[in-house]
């Protein structure tokens, strides 16, 4: 109450910020008459002047009014577009490292030019991030005219570009590209063997378009570079026979033993999208696997030798019970292709990990491709947090403002529209069954069609879009379908969706980034006329004018009919996705309307709000075909969406906490790699490693502080001779000396090792040997890091079991991941020292040959797969709820400087005790007493 009262007096934080930026807008507008007087050359020269001032120490913030005024004037001259005042505010929001929410059609692409121009003046590079190659290329080509006019260079970073082209793109002042490609380039740069093979510069400033899609929807799963691992094809085929033999249990057993309606072998958690084997399910699976000869008679699935089988059992179960054809994937040309659950697009070339994709291939009886081993991985959360300054823009960010602030430290500012919006959002209509809902949708579409009003219908899956298409065909209503299967025609369909009588069915919001203009997209058709070389200039102008006149008539006709009408056939889990669909109507002050048609059979209503709404319908005695249209029901649905959003936020936050473990480790490894690549001589590093390894070996047989009788000298001599090529008569030294200490023996062995090393260096030369050492070091570090990623993956898959022992799984994961990391670094030291001490080389030529062979073994970028797994993978990658919270993630240990402290703080004594009514540590969301507390 007090907050509301204070807001009335002082305004909200958003209003205060906009008011503050309005003062700067006034200053920019005051400069306009003066800037307009400049010639093109004088305007272009301003860029050089600004760069000089930045180099002299002037801040970009101080330069902002002048730079924005220059950019606006250049845009007027080159693009024939003048930035509105609200667009200047948007530019400031982005420059100050915030997220700007701008309505559809408000010109986000043009807004970005202001902060991009200003920040490019520093010479440190600006990245403009889009969701696909088409938008990156379109925006770069469109805006390059403006930037080139102002003397700035523009690069486009696309997939499949060669190495030289990528280096050129990153060297430009401004680089356009996709989120995936920027992330993969970062990973690839940290897998190279030469400094000049890297493409990226330091990460300075990024403007992320459709920031909600990239930083939230896609943040739950990592970018992965992987190579082929061991082949288990036959096992997937055999495991595919298991799920049909198991029965689903209906109901969940309560503490008093009740709650199970029908006993079975596994349970499904639809909210968490997880599958669990029951006690009887474990027994049945073990019996069947024993019959098939996959495990020994009477053996448990949890026996150490059967752990990999457990992984295959759950992969097969998830494939059969949680993933369905034409909803989560399609089968095309004998391959299983993932469908993006957010956009409905086909994700060709991407594969689910953890064996899930192979299990789905076995289920669909298509060729099973080999499993992959992770070579490098990073999440968008951790990649984008590395930029010195990050900003973003979208049409729908306000509902996720808390998450942007919590995870990325980014404030969201809602930017006012240039013209007041005229879209009418009608009340939801809820029907008892899906059939009644679709009947109502067809009636609404027919009404719009007869009045000449264009309609965009949003569906949540390919299956639903094709069902609706079938119903429209039966009703005799012409329409276009825009889903993953029609990907190639996407831009064409979206561009024409605003024509009179046009009915377009779209899966989720495929086609984001392309405006739906009322009356159709005349500019697109005009561009075809412009490119037609058979026409004269006069004929081109005549045809374009005629086209514009026709478009204007259609535009007025559609406006008179009410503008674009949006129909939602289902509510999405997130209010933001619903708002994106609504936002396609009413652009730039045009009229428009939207309405959602729902049924009690929709997953969201069935799982979260169905009982409450059904009770209201029963109480009102609603006849068949009648809809309920009430604010209380819509609020109930919004409440359900908020619950799902909160749950998804918790999942993402928990994933980030796990990923923060491997992120710090990744930084340490990549920093060491970069130091190795940039160092002229690594003799000191190799020497320190040799000293450490030799010390450990000697102390193993001659412990510090021990007496001579406790020493195992013959064994030490044998190990040094056989494993380290050091032939030392240590026993003779002891016999000849009256008294000799363990430290003196260590010094003697170190001296012999140094002498053997120097002899090798002298033989082939310091420079050649140093290059060889660098190759060994990089190759060993990369191989050990890959194995470490796999070890972390296995660790997180079983870490939820620590909850049974009343230990905090997250803390246990951090502690053990740190121990694994320390062990990995020790293994690297040992392996590198072993190779250097054992290598037998007679000439520099032999040394070069050995280095080349090592680099060939490490040249894993030639036969690898680059993919960004979708959320379906993250949700499915773990057989239990806690695993869902860490799925498709590789964790993150302690920061380099404080690892000892962190490890000390992670002892089991510091793990909080779980109370009976506390949430279960496994992450299921249930109370401990109703989850793992029952078992304990």
Curated annotation (Swiss-Prot):
Origin: domain of life: Bacteria
CDD domains membership: DEXDc_SecA, SF2_C_secA
Matching Pfam families: P-loop_SecA, SEC-C, SecA_DEAD, SecA_PP_bind, SecA_SW
GO molecular function terms listed in the Swiss-Prot or TrEMBL record: ATP binding; metal ion binding; protein-exporting ATPase activity
Binding-site list for Zn(2+): 920, 922, 931-932
GO cellular component: cell envelope Sec protein transport complex; cytosol; plasma membrane
Reaction catalyzed: ATP + H2O + cellular proteinSide 1 = ADP + phosphate + cellular proteinSide 2
Note accompanying the cofactor annotation: May bind 1 zinc ion per subunit.
UniProt KW keywords: ATP-binding, Cell inner membrane, Cell membrane, Cytoplasm, Membrane, Metal-binding, Nucleotide-binding, Protein transport, Translocase, Translocation, Transport, Zinc
Transmembrane segments: none
Keyword Metal-binding assigned: yes
Topological category with respect to the lipid bilayer: Peripheral membrane protein
The protein's required cofactors: Zn(2+)
Main location: membrane
Biological process, per Gene Ontology: intracellular protein transmembrane transport; protein import; protein targeting; protein transport by the Sec complex
EC category name: translocase
Annotated residues for binding of ATP: 87, 105-109, 515
EC assignment: 7.4.2.8
Assembly information from the UniProt record: Monomer and homodimer. Part of the essential Sec protein translocation apparatus which comprises SecA, SecYEG and auxiliary proteins SecDF-YajC and YidC.
The protein's role, per its UniProt record: Part of the Sec protein translocase complex. Interacts with the SecYEG preprotein conducting channel. Has a central role in coupling the hydrolysis of ATP to the transfer of proteins into and across the cell membrane, serving both as a receptor for the preprotein-SecB complex and as an ATP-driven molecular motor driving the stepwise translocation of polypeptide chains across the membrane.
Protein family according to the UniProt entry: Belongs to the SecA family.
Protein's name according to its UniProt entry: Protein translocase subunit SecA
Organism: Paraburkholderia phytofirmans (strain DSM 17436 / LMG 22146 / PsJN)
Gene: secA
């Amino acid at each position: 109450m007090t907050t509301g009262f204070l807001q009335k007096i002082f305004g909200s934080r958003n209003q205060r910020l906009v008011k503050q930026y309005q003062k700067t807008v006034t200053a920019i507008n005051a400069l306009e008459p003066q800037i307009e007087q400049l010639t093109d050359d004088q305007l272009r020269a301003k860029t050089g002047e600004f760069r000089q001032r930045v180099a002299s120490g002037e801040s970009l913030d101080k330069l902002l009014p002048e730079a924005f005024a220059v950019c606006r004037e250049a845009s007027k001259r080159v693009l024939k577009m003048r930035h509105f005042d609200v667009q200047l505010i948007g530019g400031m929001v982005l420059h100050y490292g915030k997220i700007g929410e701008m309505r559809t059609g408000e010109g986000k692409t043009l807004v970005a030019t202001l902060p991009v121009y200003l920040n490019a003046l520093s010479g440190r590079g600006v990245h403009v991030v889009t969701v696909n190659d088409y938008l990156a290329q379109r925006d770069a080509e469109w805006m390059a005219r403006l930037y080139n006019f102002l003397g700035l260079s523009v690069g486009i970073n696309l997939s499949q570009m060669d190495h030289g082209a990528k280096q050129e793109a990153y060297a430009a002042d401004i680089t356009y590209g996709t989120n995936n490609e920027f992330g993969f380039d970062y990973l690839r740069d940290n897998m190279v063997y030469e400094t000049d093979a890297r493409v990226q510069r330091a990460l300075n400033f990024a403007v992320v378009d459709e920031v909600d899609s990239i930083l939230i929807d896609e943040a739950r799963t990592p970018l992965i570079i992987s190579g082929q691992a061991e082949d288990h094809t036959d096992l997937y085929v055999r495991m595919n026979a298991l799920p049909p033999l198991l029965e689903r249990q209906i109901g969940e057993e309560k503490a008093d033993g009740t709650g199970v309606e029908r006993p079975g072998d596994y349970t499904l958690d639809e909210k968490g999208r997880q599958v669990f084997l029951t006690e009887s399910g474990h027994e049945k699976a073990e019996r069947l696997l024993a019959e098939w000869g996959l495990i020994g008679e009477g053996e448990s699935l949890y026996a150490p030798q059967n752990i990999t089988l457990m992984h295959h059992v759950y992969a097969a179960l998830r494939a059969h019970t949680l993933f369905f054809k034409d909803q989560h994937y399609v089968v095309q040309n004998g391959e299983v292709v993932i469908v993006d659950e957010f956009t409905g697009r086909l994700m060709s070339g991407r594969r689910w990990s953890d064996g899930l994709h192979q299990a789905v291939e076995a289920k669909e009886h298509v060729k099973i491709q080999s499993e992959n081993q992770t070579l490098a991985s990073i999440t968008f959360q951790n990649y984008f947090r590395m930029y010195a300054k990050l900003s973003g823009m979208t049409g729908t960010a306000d509902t996720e403002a808390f998450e942007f602030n919590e995870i990325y430290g980014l404030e969201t500012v809602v930017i006012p529209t240039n013209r007041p919006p005229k879209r009418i959002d009608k009340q939801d209509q809820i029907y008892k069954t899906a059939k009644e809902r679709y009947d109502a949708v067809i009636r609404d579409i027919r009404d719009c069609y007869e009045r000449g009003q264009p309609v965009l219908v949003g569906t949540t899956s390919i299956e639903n879009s094709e069902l609706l298409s079938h119903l429209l065909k039966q009703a005799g209503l012409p329409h276009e379908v825009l889903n993953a299967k029609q990907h190639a025609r996407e831009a064409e369909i979206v561009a024409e969706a605003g024509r009179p009588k046009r009915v377009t069915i779209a899966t989720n919001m495929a086609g984001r980034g392309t405006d739906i203009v009322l009356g159709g997209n005349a500019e697109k058709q005009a561009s075809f006329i412009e490119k037609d070389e058979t026409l004269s200039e006069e004929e081109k102008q005549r045809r374009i004018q005629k086209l514009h006149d026709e478009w204007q008539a259609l535009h007025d006709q559609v406006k008179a009919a009410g503008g674009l009408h949006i129909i939602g056939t289902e509510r999405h889990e997130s209010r933001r996705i619903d708002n994106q669909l609504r936002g396609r109507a009413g652009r730039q002050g045009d009229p428009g309307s939207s309405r959602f048609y729902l049924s009690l059979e929709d997953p969201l209503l069935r799982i979260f709000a169905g009982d409450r709404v059904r009770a209201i319908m029963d109480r009102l005695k609603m006849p068949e075909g009648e809809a309920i249209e009430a604010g209380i029901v819509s609020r109930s649905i919004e409440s359900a969406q908020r619950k799902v959003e909160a749950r998804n936020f918790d999942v993402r936050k928990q994933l980030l906490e796990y990923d923060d473990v491997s992120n710090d480790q990744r930084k340490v490894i990549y920093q060491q790699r970069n130091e190795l690549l940039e160092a002229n001589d690594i003799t000191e590093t190799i020497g320190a490693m040799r000293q450490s390894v030799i010390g450990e070996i000697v102390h193993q047989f001659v412990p510090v502080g021990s007496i001579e009788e406790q020493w195992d000298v013959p064994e030490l001599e044998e190990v040094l001779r056989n494993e380290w090529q050091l032939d030392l008569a240590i026993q003779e030294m002891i016999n000849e000396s009256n008294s000799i200490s363990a430290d003196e023996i260590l010094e003697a062995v170190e001296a012999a090792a140094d002498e053997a090393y120097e002899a090798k260096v002298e033989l082939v030369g310091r420079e050649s040997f140093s290059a060889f050492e660098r190759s060994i070091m990089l190759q060993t570090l990369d191989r050990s890091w890959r194995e470490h990623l796999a070890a972390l993956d296995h660790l997180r898959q079983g870490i939820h079991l620590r909850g049974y022992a009343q230990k905090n799984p997250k803390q246990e994961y951090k502690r053990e991941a740190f121990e694994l990391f320390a062990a990995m670094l020790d293994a690297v030291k040992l392996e590198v020292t072993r190779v250097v001490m054992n290598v037998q080389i007679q000439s520099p030529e032999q040394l070069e040959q050995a280095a080349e062979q090592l680099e060939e073994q490490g040249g894993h970028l030639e036969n690898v797969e680059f993919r960004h797994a979708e959320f379906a993978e993250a949700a499915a990658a773990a057989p239990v709820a806690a695993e869902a919270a860490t799925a498709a993630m590789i964790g993150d240990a302690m920061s380099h400087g404080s690892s000892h402290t962190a490890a000390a703080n992670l002892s089991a004594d510091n793990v909080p005790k779980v109370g009976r009514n506390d949430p279960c540590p496994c992450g299921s969301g249930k109370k401990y007493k109703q989850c793992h507390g029952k078992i304990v």
